[in-house]
């Protein structure tokens, strides 16, 4: 598979490298403010801008693109777990965030051991490549789709906490890269289920109903 990504970093000596599938995605690590209202897809007919604390993802696709939507929701959920801040999460991201937290509580020791084994191994490119290798190994095992996805999301969050607890820009880079990779890797599956929100409703109907009720009550 032809892989490409460009890194425009303010840190001297940090070279460009290749990790993500084409079409070309440009990631710019520039310091920005953190107003919640900027973290939403742009209303553009030819591109989707999903803003993160590092001014991250720019993809040449329409606003209703399921890959971009899935990438956005997975990033928001993982970053909320990382920062312990669920404020203003879209409902699908909130449900996924709660599921990640529940899985982390259940298998805390397993994920912690995995993250500790891979600490201090190199730069961001090495970290992302390692997580992708874990993702491929999990997908080769005999799990259902959501079990695989849950393992990778949980491992990525723990990995970010272990290596980037005091560096939110780097953490957002890793979380966002994996979210984008997951969305692209499973794009046909997400599209068949109608995107992340519908797939969450199908896989976790009780959880979704409770989250919807909670969200409704908070809005009263």
Curated annotation (Swiss-Prot):
Its main location: host cell. One of its GO terms (cellular component) is host cell cytoplasm. It is found in: Host cytoplasm. Pfam families: BALF1. GO terms for biological process: negative regulation of apoptotic process; symbiont-mediated suppression of host apoptosis. The keyword rRNA-binding does not apply. Keywords: Apoptosis, Early protein, Host cytoplasm, Host-virus interaction, Modulation of host cell apoptosis by virus, Oncogene. Interacts with BHRF1; this interaction modulates BHRF1 activity. Interacts with host BAX and BAK1. Modulates the antiapoptotic activity of the viral protein BHRF1. May also play an active part in oncogenesis in Burkitt's lymphomy and nasopharyngeal carcinoma. Belongs to the Epstein-Barr virus BALF1 family. This is Apoptosis regulator BALF1. It comes from Epstein-Barr virus (strain B95-8) (HHV-4).
């Amino acid at each position: 598979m032809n892989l490409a990504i460009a890194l425009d970093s303010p840190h001297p000596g940090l070279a460009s490298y290749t990790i993500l599938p084409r079409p070309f995605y440009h990631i710019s690590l520039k310091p920005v403010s953190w107003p919640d209202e900027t973290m939403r897809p742009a209303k553009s007919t030819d591109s989707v801008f999903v803003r993160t604390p590092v001014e991250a993802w720019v993809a040449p696709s329409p606003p209703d693109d399921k890959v971009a939507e899935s990438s956005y929701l997975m990033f928001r959920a993982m970053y909320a777990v990382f920062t312990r801040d669920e404020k203003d999460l879209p409902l699908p991201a909130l449900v996924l965030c709660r599921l990640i937290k529940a899985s982390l509580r259940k298998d805390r020791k397993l994920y912690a051991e995995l993250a500790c084994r891979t600490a201090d191994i190199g730069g961001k490119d090495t970290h992302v490549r390692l997580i992708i290798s874990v993702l491929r190994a999990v997908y080769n095992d005999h799990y259902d789709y959501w079990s695989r996805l849950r393992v990778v999301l949980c491992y990525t969050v723990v990995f970010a906490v272990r290596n980037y607890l005091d560096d939110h820009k780097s953490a957002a880079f890793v979380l966002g890269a994996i979210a984008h990779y997951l969305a692209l890797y499973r794009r046909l599956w997400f599209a068949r289920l109608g995107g992340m929100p519908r797939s969450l409703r199908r896989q976790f109907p009780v959880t979704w109903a409770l989250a919807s009720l909670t969200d409704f009550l908070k809005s009263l």
